[in-house]
Amino acid sequence: MGIPKEGEFVTIQSYKHDGHLHRTWRDTMVLKTSEYSLIGVNDHTLVTESDGRRWVTREPAIVYFHKKYWFNIIAMIREKGVSYYCNLASPYVLDDEALKYIDYDLDIKVFPDGEKRLLDVDEYEFHSKLMDYPEDIDFILKENVKTLVDWINNEKGPFSPEYVDIWYQRYQQLSKK
């Protein structure tokens, strides 16, 4: 697959460090691609878990992936404001099948009031031992937690006040075509 164009759809596949498929999102609409990043939107998107369970996303969400940073960001647009779910994960790759990354368990959730929570530390520690995460991965992930918190605190990139509005409006324009 070449670089997807604005308005096209991609599948997103999340893997675990041991190589098994963790979760799949069908039909994420691409809003923008650049040399290093992809911005898309999920809106009532079918999600399939590794155990076969399926569910559909409840609200629109702007997704941000980068080829250099070890995280991806989901901005969920809800009635009470935007909530962010940030996955500590490998940089993404794109092939003929899907956009793919490795999920490293740690997550940061940002609530509409700005409260931040680091989630799934126990899961990270368990999988780190079970799947034998290398020390350099542990170091990279911890450094990227710092980068992510800096972005959140300084409203950089997907955390800027205008970001969600701009990309949600673009999604609405594209979905009317």
UniProtKB/Swiss-Prot annotation:
Active site (catalytic residues): R23 (proton donor)
Entry keyword set: Hydrolase, Magnesium, Metal-binding
Record-listed Mg(2+) 1 binding positions: N87, D103, D107
Cofactors (names): Mg(2+)
Hydrolase among keywords: yes
InterPro entries (alphabetical): DUF402, FomD-like_sf, Ntdp-like, SA1684
Catalytic activities: a ribonucleoside 5'-triphosphate + H2O = a ribonucleoside 5'-diphosphate + phosphate + H(+); a ribonucleoside 5'-diphosphate + H2O = a ribonucleoside 5'-phosphate + phosphate + H(+)
Keyword Hydrolase belongs to the record: yes
UniProt EC number: 3.6.1.15, 3.6.1.6
Gene3D superfamilies in UniProt: FomD-like (2.40.380.10)
A molecular-function term among this protein's GO annotations: magnesium ion binding
Binding-site list for Mg(2+) 2: D105, D107, D120, E123
Enzyme class, broadest EC rank: hydrolase
Similarity comment: Belongs to the Ntdp family.
PANTHER family referenced in this protein's UniProt entry, alphabetically: PTHR39159, UPF0374 PROTEIN YGAC
Function: Has nucleoside phosphatase activity towards nucleoside triphosphates and nucleoside diphosphates.
HAMAP family: Ntdp (MF_01568)
Name of the molecule in the record: Nucleoside triphosphate/diphosphate phosphatase
UniProt lineage: Bacteria, Bacillati, Bacillota, Bacilli, Lactobacillales
